[in-house]
């Protein structure tokens, strides 16, 4: 099962996304549920890098993308907060759809906004 978590650490001003595990909906290389979750993680990672290049982050984002694991942490500036939060929220919406359609393969812990 893929476990997805989206959360904030107000004391650090950071927004987090983590994915762990495998969907196991099909054999490796054929699992569309896993591929969908992976694509969402890669999209957030790229968007966060673009936001950093545009000066919307206080510091470089932390991005770790490995087989069965993804962690993305962004610390937005005051001006960039809404854009960064929206980026993570859109990915959370995608994971929500996956969880709704494949509840046996995906579990989501929602970002509180």
Where are these regions (language model features)?
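N-terminal intrinsically disordered, cationic/polar leader segments
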Residues: 1-32, 42, 46-113
């Amino acid at each position: 099962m893929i476990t997805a978590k989206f959360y904030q650490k107000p004391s650090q001003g950071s927004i987090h996304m983590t994915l762990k595990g495998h969907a196991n909906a099909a054999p490796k290389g054929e699992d569309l549920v896993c591929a969908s979750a992976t694509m969402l993680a890669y999209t957030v990672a790229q968007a966060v890098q673009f936001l950093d290049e545009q000066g919307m982050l206080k510091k470089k984002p932390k991005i770790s993308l490995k087989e069965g694991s993804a962690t993305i942490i962004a610390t937005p500036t005051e001006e960039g907060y809404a854009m960064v939060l929206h980026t993570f929220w859109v990915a959370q919406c995608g994971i929500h759809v996956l969880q709704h359609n494949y509840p046996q393969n995906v579990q989501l812990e929602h970002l509180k906004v």
